[in-house]
Design a protein with these regions (language model features):
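Terminal signal-anchor or tail-anchor transmembrane helices
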Residues: 1-3, 28
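Extended, non-globular alpha-helical segments
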Residues: 3-14
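Gly/Ser-rich catalytic/binding loops embedded in alpha/beta enzyme cores
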Residues: 12-19, 26, 31-203, 207
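Short, hinge-like loop/turn segments at secondary-structure boundaries
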Residues: 168-171, 218-222
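Structural signature of FAD isoalloxazine-binding scaffolds in flavoprotein oxidoreductases
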Residues: 212-217
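A short core secondary-structure module
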Residues: 227-233
Length: 233
């Protein structure tokens, strides 16, 4: 749920004008009820002003402590290193908190949409150049502080837009319990890795089944909690 606010002053310099919504919809054969036209104009104007306010805020990027948590041997895995087709996106090692923690000794893989500073992100695609984050996602920081060791990023489906496991530009991911069959998606590589016991935990993201589907295909229990042999979000 998103709520936008507006004031009368927003209209004085706002580029959204009456009739803009109707003009945008016309090529698609869609119309707006004239009785609702003003409401749509008000909403779009408010969205614009809210977006402008957010865009004007100073950027904040937390700087990861790469002295405490160095990234070791970041690489695209060799054919010999790969498992279940192309389950790994990148291999590397970031050792967790040397003082230990509740996840000490646990091995982690991260879906290749989760930012890790210094590790290129493929997003299962080849239509855009890989992007290398300069900061760690919050979940990465929390895992390391809790003592977990991160062993790499796992292959996800192309732009995460599939619940299969054959759309990634980096290659297919096979089901560890039935090789040659789908591992599900879009957290395809992560589900295969944790189901096979190669890592203890994999971290994914789920808006439309991207954890639930591969977890069910690979025989894992997905959870928002800490469970044995689970794919978590």
């Amino acid at each position: 749920m998103v709520i936008f606010s507006y004031t009368d002053s927003c209209y004085r310099s706002n580029p959204v004008k009456p009739g803009d919504a109707e003009a945008l919809l016309k090529p698609y054969g869609l119309t707006i009820d004239p009785a609702e036209a003003q409401d749509f104009h008000t909403l779009l104007a408010a969205v614009h002003d809210c977006a402008e306010s957010v865009a004007a805020l100073p950027d904040y990027q937390p700087v990861p402590d790469q002295t405490k948590y160095p990234r070791e041997d970041v690489r695209r895995p060799s054919e010999k290193e790969q498992v279940f087709g192309q389950a790994w996106a990148h291999r590397f090692l970031i050792r967790g908190n040397p003082q230990g923690g509740p996840l000490a000794g646990k091995s982690i893989s991260l879906k290749d949409v989760i930012a890790v500073a210094g590790v290129p992100q493929l997003l299962g695609s080849d239509i855009i150049p890989s992007w290398t984050p300069s900061t760690d996602a919050t979940v990465v920081t929390r895992l390391l502080e809790a003592g977990a060791d991160i062993h790499g990023t796992s292959t996800c489906e192309n732009m995460c837009h599939s619940t299969s496991s054959y759309t990634s530009a980096q290659g297919t991911v096979e089901n560890p319990n039935a090789q040659g069959y789908s591992a599900g998606g879009s957290t395809s590589g992560g589900a295969a890795l944790v189901a096979a016991g190669i890592v203890d935990i994999t971290i994914g993201g789920d808006q439309g089944g991207s954890i639930r589907v591969p977890a069910s295909f690979c025989g894992c229990k997905m959870s928002f909690l800490l469970e044995d042999k689970c794919v978590t979000s």
